[in-house]
């Protein structure tokens, strides 16, 4: 790999258009923020159900909103700084070269100010809940915006693994926002999101392989090849399925959750195995990426609904 390819370059000149609200929203990567907010909601929800405070009143829902918004703002801040640092690499990729951060439509000083304001507001909100929640938010920010973005993404095939540590923080932050401590249910929620991320992002890596190669990003599909990546994806999916089946040991759910987790995991494992016979890796990886989103969304929704129904039936 060309070591100079990953270095930050001067972004392209902007086209003279004014900055818009839409530009700032896109800069914060709203798709990621929405998914992170929902994951934080899932963590808070499980903590609420586990604490048997289902009659907590408006205060609980206010805290839930603060946890979601605070997490969203901190993660948005980290993605803004990620876009700031990645301007040079993004200019080399077809799907990112028109971003306002690359064209110069949003100047670098404005990006820094924007990211700082988002982060400050988010940290204040998380700190208003408890110290642990704010610390977790800060660690997630530093790991993603600094450790992952500035070093591993540019220099190591381990970037996806390292990026999964801050990427899995939202449900943990949401859980601790209510409890103020980390226990086994919190660790399980974190582990599920952590193990979900590598196969999810490697599917993108296989599909966009040549774009990432042009940008000089040392992803696993580029360094080790598609087959080695598929083996890793299969392993992570197998471990994820096993971990998801540990949930009933620590969270009060019915056999419906267990059956659902087993079915969802089995489908993902089947699709992973089918990848070794795929005639078109790009098409296969597109399907894997889509299913990974379906898997995560359904697993968390079923977990939240099932635990709530169980709590209601206990009363």
From Swiss-Prot:
InterPro entries: Protohaem_IX_farnesylTrfase, UbiA_prenyltransferase, UbiA_prenylTrfase_CS, UbiA_sf. Its EC number is 2.5.1.141. It catalyses: heme b + (2E,6E)-farnesyl diphosphate + H2O = Fe(II)-heme o + diphosphate. It is found in: Cell membrane. Keywords: Cell membrane, Heme biosynthesis, Membrane, Transferase, Transmembrane, Transmembrane helix. It is an enzyme of class 2 (transferase). PANTHER family: PROTOHEME IX FARNESYLTRANSFERASE, MITOCHONDRIAL (PTHR43448:SF2). HAMAP family: CyoE_CtaB. Carbon 2 of the heme B porphyrin ring is defined according to the Fischer nomenclature. Converts heme B (protoheme IX) to heme O by substitution of the vinyl group on carbon 2 of heme B porphyrin ring with a hydroxyethyl farnesyl side group. This is Protoheme IX farnesyltransferase 1. It comes from Bacillus velezensis (strain DSM 23117 / BGSC 10A6 / LMG 26770 / FZB42). The lineage of its organism: Bacteria, Bacillati, Bacillota, Bacilli, Bacillales. The gene is ctaB1.
């Amino acid at each position: 790999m060309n070591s100079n390819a990953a270095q930050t370059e001067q972004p392209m000149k902007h086209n003279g258009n004014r900055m818009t609200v839409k530009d700032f929203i896109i800069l914060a990567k709203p798709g990621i923020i929405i998914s992170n907010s929902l994951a934080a909601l899932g963590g808070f929800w499980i903590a609420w159900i586990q604490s048997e405070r289902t009659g907590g009143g408006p205060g609980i829902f206010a805290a839930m909103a603060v946890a979601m918004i605070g997490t969203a703002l901190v993660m948005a801040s980290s993605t803004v700084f990620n876009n700031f640092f990645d301007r040079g690499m993004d200019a080399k990729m077809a799907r990112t070269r028109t971003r306002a951060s690359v064209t110069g439509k949003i100047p670098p000083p404005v990006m820094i100010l924007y990211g700082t304001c988002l982060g400050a507001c988010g940290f204040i909100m998380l700190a208003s809940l408890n110290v642990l929640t704010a610390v977790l938010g800060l660690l997630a920010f530093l790991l993603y915006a600094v450790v992952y973005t500035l070093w591993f993404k540019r220099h190591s095939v381990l970037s996806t693994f390292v990026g999964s540590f801050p990427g899995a923080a939202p449900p943990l932050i949401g859980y601790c926002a209510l409890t103020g401590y980390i226990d086994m249910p919190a660790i399980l929620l974190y582990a599920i999101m952590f193990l979900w991320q590598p196969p999810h992002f490697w599917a993108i890596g296989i599909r966009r392989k040549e774009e990432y190669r042009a940008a000089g990003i040392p992803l696993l599909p580029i360094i080790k090849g598609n087959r080695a990546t598929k083996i890793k994806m299969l392993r992570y999916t197998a471990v994820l399925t096993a971990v998801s089946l540990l949930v009933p040991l620590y969270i009060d759910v019915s056999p419906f959750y267990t059956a659902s987790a087993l079915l969802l995991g089995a489908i993902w494992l089947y699709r992973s195995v089918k990848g070794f016979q795929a005639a078109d890796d790009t098409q296969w990886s597109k399907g894997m990426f889509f299913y990974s989103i379906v898997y995560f969304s359904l697993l968390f929704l079923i977990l939240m609904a099932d635990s709530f129904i169980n709590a209601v039936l206990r009363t």
